[in-house]
Amino acid sequence: MLSSSSSSTVEQPSRGGSPGINAVSSDVLRSNILTRLDGSSLAALSCTCSNLNSFCSDESLWRQQCSATWPSTSDTRVQSIISTFPDGHRTFFSDSFPFLEHDVGINLPPSVDTSELISAVDIFYKDDVIFSRVHVTETVSGWFLCSPMRVDLVEPKELIPTRVLVTDQCKDDTWKSDLEENLSLSWILIDPTCKRAADVSTRKPVSVHRHWLTGEVHVKFSSIFVVGNKKRSEQVEFTVTVVLAVFNRREEETAVMQIREVSLVAEDKDGRNLGGKVSLEILVAAMGMKRRFRAGGEEEGKEKYIEYMERKTAKAEMKWRRGKETAMETAACWIAVLLLGFLLCFYLFMHKNLVAIMKKLIK
């Protein structure tokens, strides 16, 4: 048998059993095996035994996983914040990679000490990065707390070129199915004060449509949270909108898409924008929620969005019907008042004339 005299040799197997993982060199395990795993596989492997847990806890492995999964996390500002997390990049990955549990009600905290939110945003097309940006939002000024919640990553006159090509986009909906299948987005919000993070995106689009006037393509990612307890709860929606402008090349059948807008807003069930204070409280509370590692989270997120929009549309239609009924009742009341007024005036006019005629006859 070979002895484990160096890190590049195979260790001696245990007595009466198979060599197992102990027969693999630690250098081989670190360099050739663990580095080839994705984050979820690495996390699952760390739960198998204490030896593997020790190897899988290597900070460099998780730093590599975070940078490969979200290129924006390589930013120096993000790196400095992640270094303050309890277990560094491993904690950050376990916070950001799973989906948030949206079915559990969020209880708003009495106060929030968060002074800023860091947005680490990456957009992928066919697994290639086409947009990566880090944005800092201060959360203590009166402007943020009292204004509607909105985070914009692209300047008004800025156009970011992409490698997304569209062919015959006006004749069929192939461009739509292509974007629904191949475009993905992660919007990780980081709280430096509480040392927590969460991805508020559904990763896959929940809606893709073309604006009827400008021709721009609006791609929507949405996360819906339940705020409050079962007896008194309300649904709120955090929406990420990506606007793609189509740039046609001369004498070519293909068109290039450019990113015109990447924004995050918060709305209630009636479509009203939430203020910064309430939105911040919801986001901070959501970062402390349970996470879901279940497969098919993108499809589930889209299904929840469709259900939410159906309820929202039904409520809007009911509200419109009630408004219409109220308007008709109000109109009927005014017509009745006008009719009664007309009849009263007619009665007074006739009464006055009859009195005058009677006086003449008496004379």
Swiss-Prot record:
Disulfide bonds: none
Domain annotation F-box: ranges: 27-66
Domain of life: Eukaryota
Spans annotated as Disordered: 1-23
InterPro entries per UniProt: AT3G44326-like, F-box-like_dom_sf, F-box_dom
Gene Ontology CC: membrane; SCF ubiquitin ligase complex
Signal peptide (from-to): none
Biological-process GO terms, alphabetical: regulation of steroid metabolic process
Name of the protein in question: F-box protein At3g44326
Organism: Arabidopsis thaliana
